[in-house]
Amino acid sequence: MTPVKTQCSLAGQLYAVPLIQPDLRREEAIQQVADALQYLQNISGDIFSRISRRVELSRRQLQAISERVSLAQAKIEKIKGSKKAIKVFSSAKYPAPEHLQEYGSIFTGALDPGLQRRPRYRIQSKHRPLDERALQEKLKYFPVCVNTKSEPEDEAEEGLGGLPSNISSISSLLLFNTTENLYKKYVFLDPLAGAVTKTHTMLGTEEEKLFDAPLSISKREQLERQAPENYFYVPDLGQVPEIDVPSYLPDLPGVADDLMYSADLGPGIAPSAPGAIPELPAFHTEVAEPLQPELENEVLLAAPPPPPPPPPPPPPAPTALVSTPQPPMFPDMATAAGQVAREEDSSSSMAHTASVQGAPKEVVDPSSGRATLLESIRQAGGIGKAKLRSVKERKLEKKKQKEQEQVRATSQGGDLMSDLFNKLVMRRKGISGKGPSTGTSEGPGGAFSRMSDSIPPLPPPQQPAGDEDEEDWES
């Protein structure tokens, strides 16, 4: 047979060991005792195994924490003797998971062994007959549940109590000339003035007197009004002591030697004031335009540098070389071509290596040209040694130069080389002060124009030229 399971466990408790029922037969009692002991053994083994697993898990967590502590201690010991400044960055959030793991009971998932099916045993012995006398004797040794709860006492009535038996009429029950039942609620009233209900509680408080008035009323005293406290935050630096210490203290334990603080920390932060944003100075940037060579009809022309402000004139632009063969020149151009050829003799020795390709490799530095100009002015003696001429002579010379230029322009054709030569001559005249671009000037202006005549022109940039160009110039 199967033992009867008693429900004597608490709420949430998984295990429940059955008790041995009384008045059992011998074989039945032995079988239930064996089942109960086996059940208790299974429960004990399950409980202790779960406790051991939880202890092992806690031990592993503690070991991991100990390893982290030892690692942090080793890092601290390593940087303890260092004299270098160390920056420590703190995380914006606390290093913890967003959702904490809830505590789990060690009995989670446990099954009650009592729910398993057990083998059934058949007992051949018969039950003993019921003995009432023996049952009464057992009440002396076993506790018996008796209802010991006390019944609530009758509440005290507010009236006179129960109705007497000698009342024969309604007028004897009610108070004279009223509708009040004194046996139900006891009141004191004047039958002619009206009923005023008074209970036992009111009767008890009626005998008490009022308390004495406070001193502020009896002695006419007034309490001093306290001023409200100001809880506004007013920052103040207070008295800061001035400490005179050296700026650098070497060989101090635990103090970094590569960290310097500036004494000028700017305006203080207390008391708080609206910070004004300083105005930044305006910067004007000038973008220099790059020189872009222009190729027209296979002619390489170098752009002249921007003219500097007067009085120092800009240096002359480098002469351009033509890759095509030179056409035959007119007789009046022979002398000018010979002069240009003599200027190119210095660079003709290096012109046999390569032909003209691309932009010139060397460009005359404008600063060196200005330095050469100033040096030439110093050598000429300045304005003091200049020979002044009259204005009429200068005007006559300019008229003659204009007439000669007009004659040359009409006599010369549209030859490319002649046009280039004319532009070169006009530029040199404009630099020397003989051209029409100079305008009429009086006083020191004419002296400068005459001084510029004695200044030699800047040497042209060295450009490699082919054999054909050299032969053309020599011819």
From Swiss-Prot:
Q: Does the keyword Metal-binding apply?
A: no
Kindly give the Pfam families that the UniProt entry links to this protein.
WASH_WAHD
Chief location category: membrane
InterPro entries according to UniProt: WASH1, WASH1_WAHD, WH2_dom
> Under which name does UniProt file this protein?
WASH complex subunit 1
> Which cell locations does it reside in?
Early endosome membrane; Recycling endosome membrane; Cytoplasmic vesicle, Autophagosome; Cytoplasm, Cytoskeleton, Microtubule organizing center, Centrosome, Centriole
Region of interest (WHD1), residue spans: 1-167
Q: Which organism is it from?
A: Mus musculus
- Start and end residues of each WH2 domain: 369-391
What UniProt keywords are attached to this protein's entry? Actin-binding, Cytoplasm, Cytoplasmic vesicle, Cytoskeleton, Endosome, Isopeptide bond, Membrane, Transport, Ubl conjugation
Q: What is the name of the gene encoding this protein?
A: Washc1
N-terminal signal peptide: none
An example GO biological process term is:
endocytic recycling
Residue ranges, annotated region (Required for WASH complex assembly): 1-54
Q: Where is this region: VCA?
A: 357-475
Post-translational modification remark: Ubiquitinated at Lys-219 via 'Lys-63'-linked ubiquitin chains by the TRIM27:MAGEL2 E3 ubiquitin ligase complex, leading to promote endosomal F-actin assembly.
List the Gene Ontology MF annotations in alphabetical order.
actin binding; alpha-tubulin binding; gamma-tubulin binding; low-density lipoprotein particle receptor binding; phosphatidylinositol 3-kinase inhibitor activity
Q: Give the start-end ranges of region Disordered.
A: 300-475
> Keyword Iron on this protein?
no
